[in-house]
Amino acid sequence: LLPGAASVHHLTFRTLASARESYDLVVLGIGNSIFQPLLIDDLFEVLNRGKAKVGIFGTQYRELMPRPALDRLIDRLDMWYARYQDDVLMYGRGRGNVEHLGDWLIDQFPIVSPTEAGELHIGDEVWNDLPLDRTIQYIQRYGKVYSTRLHPLLCALTSANEVAYTEQPFDNQPAIVSGKFRSMLIDIFGRSWPEKTWFAVDRDAVIRYKQDVRRNVARLGGRLEAMLRNVAAAPPA
């Protein structure tokens, strides 16, 4: 999405102290979901060093999310490209700097037909052994997929006939769940299903979602290029 000549300095929430004095553009997130422990003062300090600031993330464990801290974060951003429509409705209502992006990882998953009639159960181990492309091929072989992880379920929606899921609880508090599965399903199908309930996949809805996300991502790329051009053309402060 960034111009080919862009020089990128990667930071994680554990390496914020290594931030440089200033940046033309700070991009917060890679399409992932943030939650309460990440809303720290060091994060806001790094954002202050950017001439332009963009967020590409969703939210999770919303019951634990301190609203004032999240509002403060959104206020600092020139644009927030939200992972879910729920994010926009809950935190972006009335704001001019919030747009729905979708989960751009779906563009990595082609629409295919399964070749195995059996049932695949996916847990945390799914990312341990195979390269990403092989993992995708493995998941897409099965016509019936049960997942406790979000992105394997998203992958399965492009191939499986039936899927089911279990939400991700917060630490040892099973009553508090991430909410990501529900938000993703509503974005794609306009509704959600209870945990551990098999449901048929509407492939046409998945295709429409893929197309929408691709258009949104293309528009995001154009916005980032325009931001960098404007920063380069701006007179020194």
Regions found by a protein language model. Give the residues of each.
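Active-site anion-handling motifs in enzyme catalytic cores
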Residues: 1-237
